């Protein structure tokens, strides 16, 4: 089979599975690099060639997590060839090839740091963007793509369409998030743009603000506040605060849009306040039972 046609067919297959544009772009980029590196017909690719490609990526000092993403792309391509195309070839990617790597625990803002950050944010737009991350758990990409049609203010909720993993969900606006969002919408310039958050200055004024622009704003405010904080940490903060307030783990999973509960469970490891509270409740019952 011609490699170009094989990759084109695979791309169509992924599109039929409703993979996001981001996923398609990453998969195609990986396969292009892999094909150029091995430089043999796809049916002649061996286990050793895959290992050699991994060595090439390690030499480029890519992180183990990134290399594993490359392997998953190649593995998926060959699974497609074998299962869907009935292509007579052996699978060159063994399961044991994935690299081990440490997963840092989610970082979150302490309670006293939240007002410290928001007190330096004067822009109504920026306060609204970051409040949606903190109170609704939106990812920075989801804030950037949020449309006016996704807002349901009468019900104090908004719809997140095609979040990570092409997963739709509903999130709810807290009182402060609702108030700050409405303040921005009243000040938002009249525009035909579908996106909620727009660039306010410069040659691109009135155009939708992009992910990098939002991240730059966060870096700006973090520096003023003297904090080390990223957009994603606001999302982590929301999850940790809900867990400390005894919210159900499945509820938090739904609000964050996690596909697997294991992803959400990682927040249990950083929720020290809840651990302390549960411990003292339990130990008091033990002491009472023993008459101490």
Question: Can you annotate each of these PLM segments?
Answer:
Residues 1-292:
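Conserved catalytic core of the tyrosine transesterase superfamily
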């Amino acid at each position: 089979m011609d490699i170009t046609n094989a990759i084109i067919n695979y791309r169509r297959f992924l599109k039929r599975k409703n993979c996001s544009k981001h996923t398609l772009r990453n998969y195609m980029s990986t396969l292009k690099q892999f094909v150029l590196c091995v430089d043999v017909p796809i049916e002649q690719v061996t286990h050793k060639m895959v290992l050699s490609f991994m060595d090439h990526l390690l030499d480029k000092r890519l992180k183990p997590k990134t290399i594993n993403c490359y392997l998953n792309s190649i593995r998926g391509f060959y699974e497609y060839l074998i299962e869907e195309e009935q292509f007579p070839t052996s699978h060159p990617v063994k399961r044991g090839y994935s690299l081990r790597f440490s997963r840092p625990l989610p970082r979150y803002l302490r309670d006293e740091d939240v007002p410290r950050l928001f007190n330096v944010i004067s822009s109504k737009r920026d306060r609204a963007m970051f409040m949606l991350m903190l109170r609704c758990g939106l990812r920075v990409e989801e804030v950037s793509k949020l449309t006016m049609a996704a807002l349901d203010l009468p019900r104090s909720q908004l719809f997140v369409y095609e979040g990570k993993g092409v997963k739709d969900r509903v999130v709810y606006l807290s009182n402060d998030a609702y108030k700050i969002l409405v303040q921005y919408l009243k000040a938002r310039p009249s525009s035909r743009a579908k996106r909620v958050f727009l660039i306010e200055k410069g040659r691109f004024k009135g155009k939708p603000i992009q992910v990098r622009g939002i991240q730059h704003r966060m870096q700006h405010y973090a520096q003023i506040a003297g904090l080390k904080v990223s957009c994603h940490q606001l999302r982590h903060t929301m999850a940790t605060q809900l867990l400390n307030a005894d919210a159900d783990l499945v509820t938090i999973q739904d609000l964050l849009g996690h596909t697997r509960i294991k992803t959400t469970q990682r927040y249990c490891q950083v929720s020290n306040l809840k651990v302390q509270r549960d411990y003292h409740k339990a130990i008091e019952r033990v002491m009472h039972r023993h008459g101490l």
